[in-house]
């Protein structure tokens, strides 16, 4: 059956958003590179990326967010991690120029155990992946561990739990077993993980959320 006949939903189900795999996983990631662009651009407006920053993207998927951030980082370094080999391969292809100039690395790794020393990154972002994190509270503590003092973490999603979600959105949450907290629950998760100066950004007219957390100077 050709992709002209198959629906995007069929490709997404086959491609497995939780752990992209196979040819359909690659197709799904390339589509997500485009569909996630608006929410990513909105969320990045809450950051001031410096040219010397060291930046980590957790659950980097097809690599589009990294490619966008790389335009602002000239002498710093960017790293993407994903536990899906298909995602790693797709993100590497998306960012081949930056990788070839040693400005970026894409690694196969999980948020459960990030392969980095404490206090490594100035900024950390995750776009549309928190839904699938296996142990959200524990995983947020792992993010805080590798974030530098005074560093910033952005959690970006195009849906959060609230009244009035569409039937289709609720169906997707059920079918893909998405972890989908309310803004208040996000704040509690971040507080209990040890983040400070937590800000919840919501987009008017959309279901988008960006949770911004900081690592206080002197934190461990």
Language model features with spans:
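Class I SAM-dependent methyltransferase SAM/SAH-binding core
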Residues: 54-113
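C-terminal lobe and adjacent flexible extensions of AdoMet/dcAdoMet transferase-like proteins
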Residues: 211-220
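A short acidic, Gly/Pro-enriched loop at the edge of an enzyme's catalytic core
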Residues: 112-123
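C-terminal alpha-helical "lid/dimerization" subdomain adjacent to the S-adenosyl-L-methionine
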Residues: 6-12, 18-33, 154-212
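Short glycine-dipeptide loop
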Residues: 52, 147-153
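Conserved alpha-helix/loop element of class I SAM-dependent methyltransferases that forms part
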Residues: 34-53, 68
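A short glycine-rich, Lys/Arg-flanked "PGG" loop and its adjoining helix->strand segment in the class I
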Residues: 137-149
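A short SAM/SAH-binding and catalytic strip from SAM-dependent methyltransferases
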Residues: 123-135
